[in-house]
Amino acid sequence: MPNKLLEVKGLKQYFNVGKKNEVHAVNDISFHIYEGETFGLVGESGSGKSTTGRTIIRLNEPTDGEILFDGQDVTKIKDKKGLTKFRHDVQMIFQDPYASLNPRMKVRDIIAEGIDVNGLAKSPEERAKKVDDLLRTVGLNPSHGTRYPHEFSGGQRQRIGIARALAVKPRFIICDEPISALDVSIQAQVVNLLQDLQREHQLTYLFIAHDLSMVKHISDRIGVMHNGLLLEMGKSDEI
């Protein structure tokens, strides 16, 4: 039986608590993800799926519930060092490849952020080699490292975001609508790249999207969200 890499138990994410405009963005949901699988989380805009992803990686402070990663409850991590270690294992690819890359940084420095924070390169030469290798891995040329994000297309920028996520050699990646901002012609290329990387690096994915057909294509199991609730869960060919 594969290992449960992630377990979400009774997760609640409320905003404006105690006020008239209190929002129950995620309302008592539970699911687990096995090591090596892709779990798709699908739902219309405002269903709570992206909030779930952001709460798992602790960009939001959960209102209630447990988030177990490899058996450790990450909601109990309070220190910066502990969070840095957690984000070494868990990375996120964001929906908007335009907004998620710093426009004032060169691509090589964007990709190397995690390498620098975690001290993964012992010299400038090793850092440069790691970045070049990552650019090649996502189908870009090492020479692209000297350019800025605005010089790239949406699909290329998303590849840069994927390279940044891979830089720290994570075990688990949250893909938050990684293709919805891209042209349809580019979407399949990015999905195929994610699948290739999963095989090569033994990655586990939480794949968040509103397009059920694309989620079914990439996922082993799927959860369907609506109004903060997880309404349905099962194998991708049964949803």
Can you say where each PLM-predicted feature lies in the sequence?
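ABC transporter nucleotide-binding domains
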Residues: 1-239
